[in-house]
């Protein structure tokens, strides 16, 4: 069974319309998550929502404990993750209000742990294709059906201190 994890970016702190909605704290060996997680069901789909910046936007991008968030999603059985971000564009053909279903990212953040691996465990994880094509196609189709201006494929860059 698919369990959809949704990571909300700036301005998205809860999901309206969830049935059987309940906020729960998830503990991880990587420390505290951004906030409690919201569990529920949306149109028959089990959903687990995490407000990435915390409710009330209390965590800056470089202070978010991404490892704890991802580990917690895994611990509660999430199989797919949809991560939403608000950001600007450097392209005139993608003005404010347009959606981009990204297929690649550049992470230039620093001053935070970036890996689950460390002393005693070395691993190499390919980031050549960091997104799920099946999920990207589904999101793109839903956005088009809802008449949102959307582009399939693009890059997102993070460079927060």
What are the language-model segments listed below?
Residues 134, 138-141, 145-147:
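Glycine-rich ThDP/TPP pyrophosphate-binding loop and its adjacent helix/strand module
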Residues 1-127:
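Metabolite-binding pocket within alpha/beta catalytic cores that recognizes anionic/polar moieties
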Residues 128-133:
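Polybasic "coupling" helices that flank or enter modular domains
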Residues 37, 156-157:
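Ordered hydrophobic segments in well-structured contexts
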Residues 159-161:
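Conserved small/polar residues in nucleotide/adenosyl-binding loops
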Residues 146-154:
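Short, structured loop/turn "capping" segments at alpha-beta junctions
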């Amino acid at each position: 069974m698919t369990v959809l994890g949704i990571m909300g970016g700036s301005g998205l702190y809860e999901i309206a319309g969830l049935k059987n909605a309940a906020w729960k704290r998830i503990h991880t060996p990587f420390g505290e998550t951004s906030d409690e997680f919201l569990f529920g069901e949306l149109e028959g789909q089990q959903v687990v929502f995490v407000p990435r910046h915390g409710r009330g936007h209390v965590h800056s991008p470089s202070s978010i404990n991404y490892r704890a968030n991802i580990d917690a999603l895994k611990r509660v059985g999430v199989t797919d993750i949809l991560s939403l971000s608000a950001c600007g564009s450097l392209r005139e053909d993608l003005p404010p209000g347009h959606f981009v279903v990204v297929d690649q990212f550049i992470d230039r953040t620093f001053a935070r742990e970036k890996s689950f691996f460390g002393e005693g465990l070395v691993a190499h994880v390919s980031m050549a294709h960091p997104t799920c094509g099946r999920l990207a196609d589904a999101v793109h189709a839903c956005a088009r059906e809802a008449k949102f201006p959307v582009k399939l494929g693009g890059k997102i860059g993070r460079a927060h201190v």
